[in-house]
């Protein structure tokens, strides 16, 4: 247990006015603070209703107090909670009283960090707390809860155990190569390591889906001026987010709105019309438009249905055709119908943004093109660092397979060691202080 010598305190409820406000205290001074602010030490895990006092024994509030002795608490340390009236001044008085008695104001995520360091949860579960707080859809919240409950950690720990067990067998073969011991045969080892590789690939696919669920996708709307880009944004968001006129070049800056498709957040980005311009302001808007288009996950190339075909030459050169979706807009001005077709391996949708016709088709296509339809209900939220670690582990396993093929058993054992370390970094078994600081600094103060 990594018990800290300092005692921390923070507001654990939302900042602002509310029916109830909570101040949380954790550390070795909890009992001292309880005696001064309550007049007694509460019985563990029992709720007590009474007066709260400041450092001068003046009554400052009345509410419920809870005490959780170490190690049976969230942080693994003594924890004291004051639940009072949710006014900003009242909460500040409680915090000031705790600080005057030796506590210090907690840093962002410090309660969760202490919980991790004291072995109450692993790094994935700690991150899941933040993900639950910041979840922007029901699906994301449920997935974060699965991570908090240990689903993702169990997958990683099981895989890490398999890698370690295989490495033990391989190293034993090295240590006792001159002995007549019946170790795993070549084909059995190869089968086991390929099973590990397949499992990593499966988890990596699920984690990649979890990234989409957690972070969403950026969808840039591109096209010439007056093609109906802003109308398309308004139709997708079902709001008048963008100004729509018949004057070309109305949109001069980037406008972003968020929608949800299949429980996944999509950031829809309306951009300035792409054309050659001598107007200084419009040129800056086009520059920003190109930046958003280049960095988008999906590009909606909007063109007028009265044109024969879209002018793809106006798009930045380094976008991926697979992320491109052609939107043939204003079909209400032609004899064309709302439909989906594939032209030169690129999906094209005929829509009328003005009358919101074909928008359901577009939302479904956004789900398809982004792979969101394949999201399983059991997916857990993941972070970029998880993907990096899984990919690195997969490379090491691939190297280990190659070393096995040529009989380089010692090098194979080393690659298995690397793979295990990469996997262990996900749950925090192997983590640097800098990584921990980066992760927990994004948390709320009271978590």
From Swiss-Prot:
Entries under InterPro entries matching the protein: G_TrmE (IPR031168), GTP-bd (IPR006073), GTP-bd_TrmE_N (IPR018948), GTPase_MnmE (IPR004520), MnmE_dom2 (IPR027368), MnmE_helical (IPR025867), P-loop_NTPase (IPR027417), Small_GTP-bd (IPR005225)
Binding residues for Mg(2+): 230, 251
Chief location category: cytoplasm
Protein name per the record: tRNA modification GTPase MnmE
Binding residue positions for (6S)-5-formyl-5,6,7,8-tetrahydrofolate: 24, 81, 120, 447
Entry's localization field: Cytoplasm
Naturally occurring in which organism (per UniProt): Vesicomyosocius okutanii subsp. Calyptogena okutanii (strain HA)
Broad EC category: hydrolase
Protein role: Exhibits a very high intrinsic GTPase hydrolysis rate. Involved in the addition of a carboxymethylaminomethyl (cmnm) group at the wobble position (U34) of certain tRNAs, forming tRNA-cmnm(5)s(2)U34.
Family: Belongs to the TRAFAC class TrmE-Era-EngA-EngB-Septin-like GTPase superfamily. TrmE GTPase family.
Domain (TrmE-type G) ranges: 216-371
CDD domains according to UniProt: trmE, TrmE_N
């Amino acid at each position: 247990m990594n018990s800290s010598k300092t005692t921390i305190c923070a507001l654990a409820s939302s900042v602002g006015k509310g029916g109830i406000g909570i101040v949380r205290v954790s550390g070795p001074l909890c009992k001292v603070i309880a005696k001064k602010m309550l007049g007694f030490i509460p019985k563990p895990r029992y709720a007590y209703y009474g007066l709260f006092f400041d450092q001068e024994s003046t009554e400052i509030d009345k509410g419920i107090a809870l005490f959780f002795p170490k190690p049976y608490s969230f942080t693994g340390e003594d924890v004291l909670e004051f639940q009072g009236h949710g006014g900003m001044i009242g909460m500040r008085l409680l915090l000031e009283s705790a600080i005057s008695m030796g506590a210090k104001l907690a840093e962002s995520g410090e309660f969760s960090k202490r919980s991790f360091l004291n072995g109450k949860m692993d790094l994935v579960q700690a991150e899941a707390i933040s993900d639950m707080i910041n979840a922007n859809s029901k699906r994301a919240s449920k997935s974060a809860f699965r991570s908090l409950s240990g689903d993702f950690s169990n997958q990683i720990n099981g895989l890490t155990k398999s890698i370690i067990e295989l490495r033990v067998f391989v190293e034993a073969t090295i240590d006792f190569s001159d002995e007549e011991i019946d170790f795993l045969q070549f084909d059995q080892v190869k089968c086991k390591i390929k099973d590990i590789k397949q499992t990593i690939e499966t988890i990596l696919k699920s984690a990649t889906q979890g990234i989409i669920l957690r972070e969403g996708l950026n969808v840039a709307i591109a096209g010439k001026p007056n093609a109906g880009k802003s109308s398309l944004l308004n139709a997708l968001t079902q709001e008048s987010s963008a100004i729509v006129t018949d004057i070309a070049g109305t949109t001069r800056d980037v406008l972003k709105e968020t929608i949800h498709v299949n429980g996944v957040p999509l950031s829809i980005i309306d951009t300035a019309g792409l054309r050659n311009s001598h107007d200084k302001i419009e040129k800056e808007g086009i520059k920003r438009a190109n930046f958003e288009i280049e960095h988008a996950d999906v590009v909606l190339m909007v063109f007028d249905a009265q044109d024969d075909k879209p002018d793809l030459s106006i798009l930045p050169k380094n976008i991926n055709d697979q992320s491109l979706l052609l939107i043939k807009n204003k079909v209400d001005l032609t004899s064309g119908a709302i439909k989906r077709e594939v032209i030169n391996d690129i999906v094209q949708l005929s829509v009328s943004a003005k009358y919101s016709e074909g928008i359901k088709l577009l939302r479904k296509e956004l789900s398809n093109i982004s792979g969101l339809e394949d999201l399983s209900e059991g997916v857990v939220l993941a972070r970029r660092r998880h993907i990096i670690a899984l990919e690195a582990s997969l490379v090491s396993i691939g190297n280990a397979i190659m070393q096995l093929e040529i009989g380089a058993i010692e090098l194979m054992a080393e690659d298995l060691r690397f793979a295990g370390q990469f996997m262990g970094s996900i749950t925090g078994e192997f983590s640097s202080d800098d990584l921990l600081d980066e992760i927990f600094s994004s948390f709320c103060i009271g978590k």
